[in-house]
């Protein structure tokens, strides 16, 4: 950052040296094993990445607030829309990045392939609910922080509570649901049409 602000939708120095870029309001930081730095630039409605070469680039978000669902889910994160104030971010063990997308009332994940999806929260701003069910159907109002464990489960700071999403739920995509096997050792994942998609280990979440 060069000490001056910028406006949503402007490049703000992306593609150039980070020291000369404009930074608006950083609410979260995460450092990758390769030394890259990710920052949640809330007022710019995007997540940005500073590589080892010192170049800053947009990583997720166009800078424009989401007005039409699904806000870019299922496509390139750089073309997605984030909330007015994305806050906490965290890196997962598989090099994915999790974003507490506060005003959209959800947790979003950018995979190593650059595709963004919602992994927790149905977007509603109501009293928290949905514990014990799929994370994507739960009500998670205004999450502020997220932390990811080694097994792929993640924790959400949410309105006076910390909520946990297990590795099985963390493996679900939007619209999917699961059923446990009779002995509880496996979980069967189905899409919204009821078609079986994959089988997961109930303990680890691995396929």
Task: Describe these PLM feature segments.
Residues 45-48, 105-108, 161-164:
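Structural signal for beta-propeller blades
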Residues 166-207:
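Surface-exposed recognition patches
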Residues 31-34, 91-94, 148-151:
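Residue-level detector of Asp-centered blade-edge/turn motifs that repeat once per structural unit
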Residues 42, 102, 159:
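Short loop/turn segments immediately following the C-termini of beta-strands
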Residues 1-25, 54-85, 113-142:
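Gly/Pro-rich loop segments of beta-rich domains
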Residues 142-168:
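Blade-level signature of beta-propeller repeat domains, shared across WD40, Kelch, NHL, RCC1
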Residues 36-38, 96-99, 153-156:
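Conserved beta-propeller blade signature
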């Amino acid at each position: 950052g060069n000490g001056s602000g910028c406006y949503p939708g402007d490049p703000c120095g992306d593609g150039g040296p980070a020291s000369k870029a404009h930074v608006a309001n950083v609410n979260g930081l995460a450092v990758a094993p390769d030394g890259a730095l990710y920052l949640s630039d809330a007022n710019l409605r995007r997540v940005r990445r500073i590589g080892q070469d010192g170049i800053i680039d947009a990583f997720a978000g166009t800078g424009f607030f989401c007005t039409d669902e699904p806000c870019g889910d299922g496509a390139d994160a750089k073309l997605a829309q984030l909330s007015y104030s994305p806050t906490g971010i965290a890196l997962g063990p598989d090099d994915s990045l999790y974003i507490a997308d506060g005003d959209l009332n959800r947790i979003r994940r950018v995979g190593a392939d650059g595709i963004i999806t919602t992994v927790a929260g149905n977007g509603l701003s109501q009293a928290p609910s949905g514990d014990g069910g799929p994370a994507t159907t739960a009500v998670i109002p205004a999450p502020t922080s997220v932390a990811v464990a080694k097994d792929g489960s993640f924790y959400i700071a949410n309105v006076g509570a910390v909520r946990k999403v297990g590795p099985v739920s963390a493996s679900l995509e939007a619209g999917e649901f699961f059923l446990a096997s009779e002995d509880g050792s496996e979980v069967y994942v189905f899409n919204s049409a009821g078609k079986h998609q994959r089988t997961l280990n109930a303990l680890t979440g691995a396929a």
